[in-house]
Amino acid sequence: MSIARRTTLSKFLIEQQRETNNLPADLRLLIEVVARACKAISYNVSKGALGEALGTAGSENVQGEVQKKLDILSNEILLDANEWGGNLAAMASEEMETFFPIPANYPRGEYLLVFDPLDGSSNIDVNVSIGTIFSVLRCPDGKQATEESFLQPGTEQVAAGYAVYGPQTVFVLTTGNGVNCFTLDREVGSWVLTQSNMQIPADTREYAINASNARHWYEPVQRYVDELNAGKDGPRGDNFNMRWIASMVADVHRILNRGGIFMYPADKRTPDRPGKLRLMYEANPMSFIVEQAGGAATTGTQRIMEVQPTGLHQRVPVFLGSKNEVERVTGYHAEGEGK
């Protein structure tokens, strides 16, 4: 690709703003700030042990999970980058118990930013792809945010995206008008458009699930996976492959590129907790992206983006990816009225 003919993220967003007239300037600027923060996170991730940021921080987040040093650093990078620009009323992070209002000494805007600063951080020390997930909502209360301001269904998202820090660093974005992927050119420091209007195939022969939990699954999931594992001799009449990276951004990025279904169901170990993934920080933004790419995303019983949040750290079961497979496993839940 000729350097002169490259489309950078900034150019792409400005053209979107001109052509569609549904991308406000403040939202465009907010997305660019998030993308710059992801570049800074990518730089720190890539330094590895040389950056003295590997290992645990000796603390736990609100989820009760041990925090990695890079979890905390990534969270701080996103907060510091976005607090002063005048585009936001508040932010909420998977790593923080309560939301973060924009300090009084900075101007406030009309948007809310929700993020998982470093998804898949258990993989940091073993050099497996990890990433950042984010979602943007409008603040319904003008510029004075409360926790309730964030509790909007995913259908209210105005933008969502993720960055993957892997062999390449990529930034995947939707503003409700398709899904596009930008690759970080480290030589010039720009995000360059490398994939336009990404589409997930409706059919697939790949699935992603943590099979070590099989003994805990509810019957609809057990039935679905058993059929896949039966291969050509089973009811599906075809062979399926399992892929599991244990990093949602990496698994979803693969599915976005070549199809597949990602599953993180509820299970019998914690019947009072419906799933592990967080609705606001992971499930909603990924569902927005997947649906914009022609896929589907459900909890097994309803469309993820129609779930009404009841708390910042609410968890949900997740089934997303190739439309026909998501519809099949969702249908099994309906037949069994199970989880």
From Swiss-Prot:
Mg(2+) 1 binds at E94, D116, L118. Its EC number is 3.1.3.11. Pfam families: FBPase (PF00316), FBPase_C (PF18913). The keyword Glycoprotein does not apply. It is found in: Cytoplasm. It is an enzyme of class 3 (hydrolase). Gene3D superfamilies: 3.40.190.80, Fructose-1,6-Bisphosphatase, subunit A, domain 1. GO terms for cellular component: cytosol. Its main location: cytoplasm. Keywords: Carbohydrate metabolism, Cytoplasm, Hydrolase, Magnesium, Metal-binding. Pathway: Carbohydrate biosynthesis; gluconeogenesis. Substrate binds at D119, G120, S121, S122, N210, K276. Homotetramer. HAMAP family: FBPase_class1. This is Fructose-1,6-bisphosphatase class 1. It comes from Burkholderia ambifaria (strain ATCC BAA-244 / DSM 16087 / CCUG 44356 / LMG 19182 / AMMD). The lineage of its organism: Bacteria, Pseudomonadati, Pseudomonadota, Betaproteobacteria, Burkholderiales.
